């Protein structure tokens, strides 16, 4: 498997994984709008099949992780860590001060991944998610050390 930078040609595959992983997935149009607005997406692929992706938006030296998703069959195989590692390297290359993201409080595996990469919980967003309603943990990684 390899990590690649995604573009508009990958939108159907990104949308497929969005629909596999999220109750409220981004539409193909939303993904296209994000790419055209300058958001950067990385994917993990093998034999031209996309197994996961991570998206980030950088504004004024701040990186906001849009989404990280891995097809259910491939979770726990290191794809999420590889994607996040690439995303963090990209943010550092862009001289970002930090990377931030939100995650459902119940998503223990994602929380463990983010903590293993050096992210720290900086707060809670009450009732941030719906279906079901749930708080989000806010994580931040300082990248300008």
Feature annotation, model-predicted:
Residues 2-73, 84-86, 90, 94, ...:
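Acetyl-CoA-dependent GNAT
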Residues 65, 99-103:
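Conserved hydrophobic beta-strand within the GNAT/NAT acetyltransferase core sheet
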Residues 135-145:
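Terminal substrate-recognition subdomain of acyl/acetyltransferases
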Residues 71-77, 105-106:
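Active-site acidic-Proline motif in GNAT/NAT acetyltransferases
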Residues 84, 107-110, 127-132:
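Short glycine/proline-centered loop/turn elements that form peptide/ligand docking sites
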Residues 102, 115, 120-135:
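Conserved catalytic-core motifs of GNAT/GCN5-like acyltransferases
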């Amino acid at each position: 498997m390899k990590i690649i930078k995604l573009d508009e040609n990958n939108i159907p595959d990104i949308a497929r994984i969005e629909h596999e992983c999220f109750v409220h997935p981004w539409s193909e149009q939303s993904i296209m709008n994000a790419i055209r607005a300058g958001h950067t997406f990385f994917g993990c692929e093998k034999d031209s099949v996309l197994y996961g992706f991570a998206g980030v938006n950088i504004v004024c030296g701040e990186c906001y992780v849009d989404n990280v998703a891995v097809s259910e069959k491939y979770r726990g195989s290191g794809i999420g860590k590889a994607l996040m590692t690439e995303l963090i390297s990209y943010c550092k290359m862009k001289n970002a001060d930090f990377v931030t993201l939100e995650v459902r409080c119940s998503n223990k595996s994602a929380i463990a991944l983010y903590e293993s990469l050096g992210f720290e919980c900086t707060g809670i967003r009450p009732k941030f998610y719906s279906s079901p309603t749930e708080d989000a943990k806010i994580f931040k990684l300082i990248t300008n050390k």
